[in-house]
Amino acid sequence: IKTGTWYWQLTTAGQALSTKPYAVPAIISFLEGRSLVYHSFILKQGIRHLSWVHVDLFNFHWTKRYFKSNKHEKKCYELMDDVIFVSNDAKNKFQQLFNVTTSTKVIYNLIDCKTIVLRANEFKVEKRKFTVCLVGRLVRQKQFDSIIRVARIFVDNGYDIDFWIVGAGCLESDLSKMIHDLHLDDNVHLLGYKPNPYVYIKCADLFVSCSLAEGFSLVVAEALCLGKAIVSTKTVGPVELLGSNSEYGVLADNDDESLYNAIKLFVNDYNKVFVYQDKAAKRSLMFDVEKTMNEIYSIL
């Protein structure tokens, strides 16, 4: 993505915002990229300025299209009083890229395990066989093409497994064609957008995340709340959530063979599913709504 592609389109709107005659206790740009650009135009309208970073910008620098240069993006972050990250690893990768002097803090995403568990029990779905569930937008970052290729490897090796992909997005037609071309219509199922994905995560035997980059991975945290055995590629958020040595879920390198081998561990030995379900339930105790809210209030 070319640096600065959209910056000049944002400038006019940002300058218009800067003329608004009001001041507030705090202004928060809760997403990277465009919202930070707008924020940089309205500094006089707020007393405190906070910006959130949700992703690994070192490995997936999708925001550069909104800035004139990396130096310009760094300057915008250094105009903030605090930059907040959703994981320690996301912060470390950010500093590798920008090395800002601004105050930085880590506050995990708000995860309400009680509500997630309640919603997972709202209704039931049925599975036919060993089932792997994935949830996310059908975009390049999530790498669902990888899991389709992995499914082909399983079929070629005589396994009969279902893969559920819950989500919608711009790559839906491409992924659907790939499934059909690889003769996987009976194994890989694009379920589309579901307002309650937790039911599908709960029903499946294994939850998988095959993303290219994640800052925290909300869906991995939600799968932990549901006590699911988890396989994830080694992106910064899941590594922090699951443990760098796969203490709470199995981490795989970002290639098809590694992902296949990690999933196969559970398919070949269902006892591992039970073991990691127990580990996930224990790990979910790290999520504390009151603690997270107090951390947010403390910086406002």
Regions found by a protein language model. Give the residues of each.
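An aromatic- and histidine-rich active-site surface loop
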Residues: 5-17, 25-46
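Membrane-proximal helix-turn-helix segments that form the acceptor-binding/catalytic region
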Residues: 14-22, 66-83
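Carbohydrate-associated surface elements
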Residues: 89, 110
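A conserved mid-protein helix/loop that constitutes part of the nucleotide-sugar donor-binding site
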Residues: 130, 134-153, 159, 163, ...
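Nucleotide-activated donor-binding/catalytic signature segment of Leloir-type glycosyltransferases, i.e.
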Residues: 176-192
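Aromatic "clamp/platform" in nucleotide-sugar-dependent glycosyltransferases that forms part
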Residues: 193, 212
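Short hydrophobic beta-strand element within catalytic cores of glycosyltransferases
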Residues: 229-232
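Conserved acidic donor-binding segment of nucleotide-sugar-dependent glycosyltransferases
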Residues: 244-257, 265-270
